[in-house]
Amino acid sequence: QAVKQAIDQCAAVGFEMVIMTFGSGFQIENDSVSYLQRMKALNSYAADKGIAIGGYSLLASRGAKPKDAAISHHTGYPAKTREEGSRFGLSPCIASDWGSDYFKRLKNFFHTTGMNVFENDGSYPGDPCSSTVHSGHKGYLDSQWKQWNRISSFYQWCRAKGIYLNVPDWYFLMGSNKTPMGYVETNWSLPRSYQEIIERQNIYDGTWQKTPSMGFMFVPLTQYHGGGAAATIEPLNEHLDHYETRLRNLFGAGVQACYRGPRLYDTEQTRKLVTQWVAFYKQYRQILDSDIIHLRRPDGQDWDGIMHVNPQSKRKAFISVYNPLDIAIEKEIEVPLYYTGLTDKAIVKEQDKNGKEYSLARDYSISLKIRIPAKGYNWYIIE
């Protein structure tokens, strides 16, 4: 019922995906007929509402029996530390019989249930294995290649089946869709006001080598790690200003987050707020999903901002500017328009209204007067 409520709320506000993640009770390796049928019915319920659904599996750091573990080249025993060859503690060798069974169970789950989202938290991190009895590799020298090839083949299988992949590692060329934007998990236990700035810093720093849609962020609707009431958004209707800041931080950057909690809204006012920002993102989705030009990094001392650019779209640029201060900001900034494809003239529309023409300088820039309300946000379209 909790998952169905999440599906219903996603459909109501325009969200598109539900992930049953760690702590939810989801058991992707449970291959009992009754459990698989329950998950199949849940997938049908989600599909009827236009929602993609799937779940989580821990691979690295999950622990392992000695016969299945990645064996240290230095000690001859299961590796438990980085010095012994393990990136995240005691982990299985996925080129073992255990690994074969693991991927067989995952494929069976998706084939049987029809679910189409997989979050592989702790993908294969590159641990070598010195075992000479594992069925999938000969020894230490081929162990990394064999393990990497096995998980890469699985991700390619997922991609071919239309399964969306959240993978916290750089497996994009193997079929993965998203990796973390670059946050530190314990930051989401800090007071809410800290999280607002840190979130924008993560987005700013995480989009030099990624497009916005390649990196996922995190919003702790309920407590995550720690921090208590000061760090969480629940009750949602009591923290609407903060909730809106998080939504505009993310949707204004074209970045999707994992909203961790059982619900997206708790009152009609909260529902309208979330719906408003989802609709905003979808209206400008093409340009908001486009590459980012970095204007000013967030530091909590002055304005910060980013600009999406896409020379192939009608909207050549989308500027998002934020004000962390208790007073309004009004100033001239230089906006570099080279990557918009514009060469002579640009039309700037504050919040998509009342276009004003600007002539580009020789370096393809314009000088733009921005206005941002206290603790607020503003945006500009360039055509």
How would you label these PLM feature ranges?
Residues 1, 21-36, 84-103, 135-147, ...:
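The substrate-binding groove and active-site-proximal loops of carbohydrate-active enzymes
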Residues 1-69, 100, 257-302, 310-317, ...:
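Conserved structural scaffold segments of CAZyme catalytic domains across common CAZy folds
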Residues 16-23, 103-136:
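Active-site groove signature of glycoside hydrolases
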Residues 17, 50-54, 116-117, 162-166:
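Structural preference for beta-strand elements that scaffold enzyme active sites
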Residues 37-44, 48, 52-115, 124, ...:
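Active-site-adjacent "subsite" loops/lids of carbohydrate-active enzymes
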Residues 39-51, 143-163:
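Alpha-helix-loop-beta-strand connector modules within alpha/beta enzyme cores
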Residues 151-355, 369-371:
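Active-site-proximal substrate-binding groove within the catalytic cores of carbohydrate-active enzymes
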Residues 359-383:
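C-terminal beta-strand-rich structural cap/linker in extracellular carbohydrate-active enzymes
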